[in-house]
Amino acid sequence: MDFEKAQNRIIEFIRNETDKAGVDGAVVGISGGIDSALTATLTVEALGKERVLGLHMPESSLTPAVDSEDAKILADWLGIEYRTIDISGIVSAFMASIPESESSDRLTRGNLKARTRMSLLYFHANRLNRMVVGTGNKTEILLGYYTKYGDGGVDLEPIGGIYKTEVWELSRRLGIPDPLITKKPSAGLWTGQTDEAELGISYLKVDDVLRMIEEGAEQEKILKDTGISIEQLNSVTRRIERNEHKRKSPPVPELY
């Protein structure tokens, strides 16, 4: 990848999309992770720091302190307006109002948290006449590794065309603080969760697999070149197929 060209195209994309929408700026969810750090950095490059609001939305009993610290470090480094909103009370009130919540599984609860954050982002975007800028990368989008109408509920996805491993490389080139680049990726939806453990494969390997699938490589070649197991490959392809609905608008019947 030509990273300088990619950087310039993403910046131009953000600028063009916000101009077309006639909005006054952007709201970005800042988790303390590298995807949101890169997205916020590129958005500031496109619009200027005065037009970017960063929202950090931890869950007090779950979000590691280091994530909140890193989110603040990033906001200070960028010089953007920054707010912290603890979602614990909102989620607790929601769960308390639904009797079935006690028997819900952790994925259901995790998705609720992601959708709560989406609602907060849009509240502030509507209030300020701004767009919600998403932080999803190409790896996550292809795998469907995000919450539908949660972190997937955004107005644009500036880094949606670059793989996770490329996110790390572009972030290094932009000088983003190193602690955000080197920490283990996690959606932070439950205690001890990490992306690679949940996926059952490293981002380095899964990006190689996704590239080869896009190029039309045969199964045997993918297994040989990447060194992954057939179980890991099947897991990746199942995710792509099972989550296709996330990458499309809701289907509408043809009536005429």
From Swiss-Prot:
Pathway note: Cofactor biosynthesis; NAD(+) biosynthesis; NAD(+) from deamido-NAD(+) (ammonia route): step 1/1
SUPFAM superfamilies per UniProt: Adenine nucleotide alpha hydrolases-like
- Pfam families annotated for this entry? NAD_synthase
- InterPro entries (alphabetical): NAD/GMP_synthase, NAD_synthase, NH(3)-dep_NAD(+)_synth, Rossmann-like_a/b/a_fold
Residue numbers binding deamido-NAD(+): 115, 148, 155, 245-246
Q: What is its EC number?
A: 6.3.1.5
At the top of the EC hierarchy, this enzyme's class is ligase
Q: Which residues bind ATP?
A: 29-36, 135, 164, 186
Q: Name one GO molecular function term.
A: glutaminase activity
Q: Which GO terms describe its cellular component?
A: cytoplasm
**Has the keyword Ligase been applied to this entry?**
yes
Q: Give me the residues that bind Mg(2+), please.
A: 35, 140
Catalytic activities: deamido-NAD(+) + NH4(+) + ATP = AMP + diphosphate + NAD(+) + H(+)
Keywords attached to this Swiss-Prot or TrEMBL record, sorted alphabetically, are: ATP-binding, Ligase, Magnesium, Metal-binding, NAD, Nucleotide-binding
Q: Which GO terms describe its biological process?
A: NAD biosynthetic process
**What is the annotated role of this protein in its UniProt record?**
Catalyzes the ATP-dependent amidation of deamido-NAD to form NAD. Uses ammonia as a nitrogen source.
Q: Which family does it belong to?
A: Belongs to the NAD synthetase family.
Q: How does it assemble?
A: Homodimer.
Q: What is this protein identified as?
A: NH(3)-dependent NAD(+) synthetase
The organism named in the record is Methanosarcina acetivorans (strain ATCC 35395 / DSM 2834 / JCM 12185 / C2A)
